Amino acid sequence: MKAGIVPVTPLQQNCSLIWCTATNKGALIDPGGDLDKLKAAVERSGVELEKILITHGHMDHCGEAGVLAKELGLPIEGPQEADRFWISRLDEDGARYGMNSQVFEPDRWLEDGDTVTVGNLTLEVIHCPGHAPGHVVFFHRPSKFAVVGDVLFQGSIGRTDFPMGNHQDLIDAITQKLWPLGDDVTFIPGHGPTSTFGQERKTNAFVSDYALS
């Protein structure tokens, strides 16, 4: 498995390109915008796109996912269906904030414990509400690698002051669902640099073992 990051939208959201090295088939996770930039990155990589994966329904993560899916003939998998609330607002939110954003219907809603395939890779789906009610994390166990969206960042956690956000749900998701995966798991967050769960358990002011003790 390999992965690359392409920051998109004015919010510099980390769209991830992941691919199976055995088959050269890949997926874009959270193609929120800047589609020309994303298509150029995919073309440079030589990866054959197989699908689009979505962590949650906020517009910087999926505002143009439906447009890209139609253009390239790709299915969309994710998020969990509680985020229909956010996806149904994409047109309205895009107009409000001056970003390209269109409502779409995923081909497959995901649930906790589901798996998604990319080439020969199998990613585990972990439902992690709190920032958004239908937020999911994608975890590749053999590589100890996760794409966590806006659940967790280097040194911070996702905002919970949006509609249907819940701070305690987010803390519980991180400590009860992500930490048990192992300190040696590397993750790509929705914004900012990569980190490891172990590093965040040591130093994150919101969810370190010390902060929660």
Q: PLM features: what roles do these ranges have?
A:
Residues 1-45, 137-149:
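Conserved beta-strand hairpin/beta-sheet module of binuclear metal-dependent hydrolase folds
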Residues 2-4, 48, 75, 108, ...:
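Conserved beta-strand segments of alpha/beta enzyme cores
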Residues 6, 18, 112-118:
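Short acidic-hydrophobic surface loop/beta-edge motif
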Residues 6-8, 99, 105-107, 127-129:
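Short Gly/Pro-enriched turn/cap motifs at secondary-structure boundaries
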Residues 22-23, 33, 59, 83, ...:
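Short, glycine/acidic-enriched loop or turn micro-motifs at the edges of active sites
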Residues 28-29, 50-57, 77-80, 127-130, ...:
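Active-site neighborhood of phospho(di)ester-bond hydrolases with catalytic His/Asp-centered motifs
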Residues 33-117, 202-210:
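Active-site HxH/HxHxD metal-binding segment of metal-dependent hydrolases
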Residues 91-93, 115, 121-213:
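Metallo-beta-lactamase
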